Curated annotation (Swiss-Prot):
Disulfide bonds: none annotated. The gene is PUB12. Gene3D superfamilies: Adaptor protein Cbl, N-terminal domain, Leucine-rich Repeat Variant, Zinc/RING finger domain, C3HC4 (zinc finger). ARM repeats lie at residues 387-427, 430-469, 471-510, 512-551, 553-592. Residues 337-349 have a biased composition (Low complexity). InterPro entries: Adaptor_Cbl_N_dom_sf, ARM-like, ARM-type_fold, Armadillo, RING-Ubox_PUB, Ubox_domain, Znf_RING/FYVE/PHD. Its EC number is 2.3.2.27. Residues 329-352 are annotated as: Disordered. This is U-box domain-containing protein 12. GO terms for biological process: cell surface receptor signaling pathway; protein ubiquitination. It comes from the Eukaryota. GO terms for molecular function: ubiquitin-protein transferase activity.
């Protein structure tokens, strides 16, 4: 018996190490650390193969191998986590991730130390090899990352989040994108999904400031990649991203030719100048570069022989011709789209910029519908371009005028422009309060959500999601009656509309007071219907919202009445890891409230599924499975004490 058990156990360990090796090949900022761990474990393979093939066996050896098995499970879970989680998260939370590696290393070292090597029939060479592994593990326990993390990468990511408007930000974005290998549409989509998973796996808890940081950094990387690859298909990112962002088609925003964009700011040049290296830059950008003490050309790294800047009149003329041929107003000096390190101060805006905004504000109040429509459309595009524009437009008093346009029922296009302008302005954190409180925009946005065109309703939902990032806004939005029309959009909207409604509802329902409103608005039946329609592509979002609602008394009652237990058990049986953990989270609430759900779930065969999930699920899934197993165990004990019947006996009587 011991021999057979030892053989199977050794083979299991071999398979685990090989699986860890395959996981460690994934692209991640922790790749080097993963590879080190995998390499050390691979040195154990010859010993395990000999143990598997040897005839001799003992319970002491088997027990030691069981300890190794547990430590390998922890190692596999960690590497799987690192390979699937957000890359930006791994950089920003590097200390937290390193603690996890230290813990796994400690567990491996302890497990390998108790193996009775003197009782194993293995060669001295193999014993020395295992001893080498132990030495390497102990040595790594004394380190806290060392060369695993690139300090420059960490500082660059922090600088991108702080976003102080540096003209050299594009260089930092390039470095970060290249080091994190976020240079293609596939890379960006996966990173967006990883961030969205972090929100979903929070189980209703506010993801917090760290999520906001990661979202902001990802948006800057995405904007950079799209600038250099203007033909990228953005649709998957727009549907899946957890960032609030502009909803205009690429055709609404022409990408200038590369030679017309400053190599530093990556924006259309308004005052191009030539430096001694022969390269052309935006005057203000290269001026700040030189004032920062740099003596080389940013593009060629060639030493600049002088700081003389010669106006490039030919290029300026070509830029003006390109703008005219594409129906774009030629750039003025200085241009409203030009970033500035003082963008947060409206008083520093150039006169031309101020005059341009004032002209648009006058059009917004015009009695002519065409003027209002064109002004709202232009503000929509300007607010999409960069944060400087968003700050300047909001500071000028444009938001209340845009809010007034939300209730215009006879001009759907103006209404779309207005709500999308507010969406784009809301991306700037400091504008959120102005939109919600200073301008009282929420009732108007809700009106659009109820009465607008499908595009306007979609963007209204996206706006509410953006604004609800602030906790106080969740209360205001819920009190304004936004939840019922969001439920309606989730039920009958387009695919993008459903996604927008789901993300907004998820965010709003994090606040306890909104959960009851959502239940009373009929959200639970809509979610249950979407769960049974896999082609809707809304399973992940529906389960995430159900996990939040089921923590509310009304939510538990409604979910239980919807005959949800069989559906949830099916997802635990065959769903994705995220679906399994959210289904288990819902069942934790249901089964703590109604014992009939316990009996029904066990009758459906949930016990084996939970045991498997407790061993091999995600971290959150393991916790939820353990909670359910504990609940089943306590209920069974109670029934035995009171009636002498176990849970299985009760099931047989049903």
């Amino acid at each position: 018996m011991a021999k057979s058990e030892k053989h199977k156990l050794a083979q299991t360990l071999i398979d685990s190490i090989n699986e860890i090796a395959s996981i460690s090949d994934s692209v991640t900022p922790m790749k080097k650390h993963c590879a080190n761990l995998s390499r050390r474990l691979s040195l154990l393979l010859p010993m395990l193969e000999e143990i598997r093939d040897n005839q001799e066996s003992s319970s002491e050896v088997v027990n030691a191998l069981l300890s190794v098995k547990q430590s390998l499970l922890h190692a596999k879970d960690l590497l799987s986590f690192v390979s699937h989680v957000s890359k930006i998260y791994l950089v920003l939370e590097r200390d937290q991730v390193m603690v996890k590696f230290q813990k796994v290393t400690s567990l491996l070292e302890q497990a390998l130390s108790i193996i009775p090597y003197e009782n194993l029939e293995i060669s001295d060479e193999l014993k020395e090899q295992v001893e080498l592994v132990l030495v390497q593990l102990r040595r790594s326990l004394g380190k806290r990352g060392g060369d695993v993390y690139d300090d420059e990468l960490y500082k660059d990511v922090l600088s991108l989040y702080s976003g102080r408007g540096s003209v050299m930000e594009s260089d930092m974005v390039r470095r970060v994108a290249e080091k994190l290998q976020l240079m293609t549409i596939t890379d960006l989509t996966q990173e967006s999904l990883a961030l969205l998973d972090m929100v979903s796996s929070s189980g209703g808890d506010d993801p917090g400031e760290s999520f906001e940081k990661m979202s902001m950094v990802l948006k800057k990387i995405k904007d950079f990649v799209q600038t250099y690859n203007p033909n990228l298909d953005d649709a998957p990112l727009r549907l899946k991203s957890s960032l609030p962002k502009s909803r205009d088609d690429d055709r609404d925003m022409l990408i200038p030719p590369e030679e017309f964009r400053c190599p530093i700011s990556l924006e259309l040049m308004t005052d191009p100048v030539i430096v001694s290296s022969g390269q052309t830059y935006e005057r203000e950008c290269i001026k700040k570069w030189l004032e920062g003490g740099h003596l080389t050309c940013p593009k060629t790294q060639e030493t600049l022989t002088s700081d003389i800047m010669t106006p490039n009149y030919v290029l300026r003329s070509l830029i003006a011709q390109w703008c005219e041929s594409n129906g774009i107003e030629p750039p003025k000096r200085p241009n409203i789209s030009q970033p500035s390190s003082k963008a947060s101060s409206s008083s520093s805006a150039p006169d031309d910029e101020h005059n341009k905004i004032e002209e648009l504000l006058l059009k917004l109040t015009s009695q002519q519908p065409e003027d209002r429509r064109s002004a709202a459309g232009e503000i929509r595009l300007l607010a999409k371009q960069n944060n400087h524009n968003r700050v300047a437009i909001a500071a000028s008093g444009a938001i209340p005028l845009l809010v007034n346009l939300l209730t215009i029922s006879n001009d759907s296009r103006t209404q779309e422009h207005a709500v999308t302008s507010i969406l784009n302005l809301s991306i700037c954190q400091e504008n959120k309060g102005k939109i919600v409180y200073s301008s009282g925009a929420v009732p108007g946005i809700v009106h659009v959500l109820q009465k607008g065109s499908m595009e306007a309703r979609e963007n209204a939902a996206a706006t509410l999601f953006s604004l609800s990032v602030i906790d106080e806004n969740k209360v205001t939005i819920g009190a304004a009656g936004a939840i019922p029309p969001l439920v309606t959009l989730l039920s009958e909207g387009s695919q993008r509309g459903k996604k927008d409604a789901a993300t907004a509802l998820f965010n709003l329902c994090i606040f306890q007071g909104n959960k009851g409103k959502a239940v009373r608005a009929g959200l639970v039946p809509v979610l249950m219907r979407l769960l049974t329609e896999p082609e809707s592509g809304m399973v992940d979002e529906s389960l995430s919202i159900l996990a939040i609602l089921s923590s509310h008394p009304d939510g538990k009652s409604e979910v239980g009445a919807a005959d949800a237990v069989p559906v949830l058990v099916d997802f635990i049986r065959s769903g994705s890891p995220r679906n399994k953990e959210n289904s288990a989270a819902v069942l934790v609430h249901l089964c703590s409230w109604n014992q009939q759900h316990l009996i029904e779930a066990q009758k459906l065969g949930i016990m084996d599924l939970l045991i498997e999930m407790a061993e091999n699920g995600t971290d959150r899934g393991k916790r939820k499975a353990a909670q359910l197993l504990n609940r089943f165990s306590r209920f069974n004990d109670q029934q035995k004490q009171h009636s002498g019947l176990g849970l299985e006996d009760q099931i047989s009587l049903i």
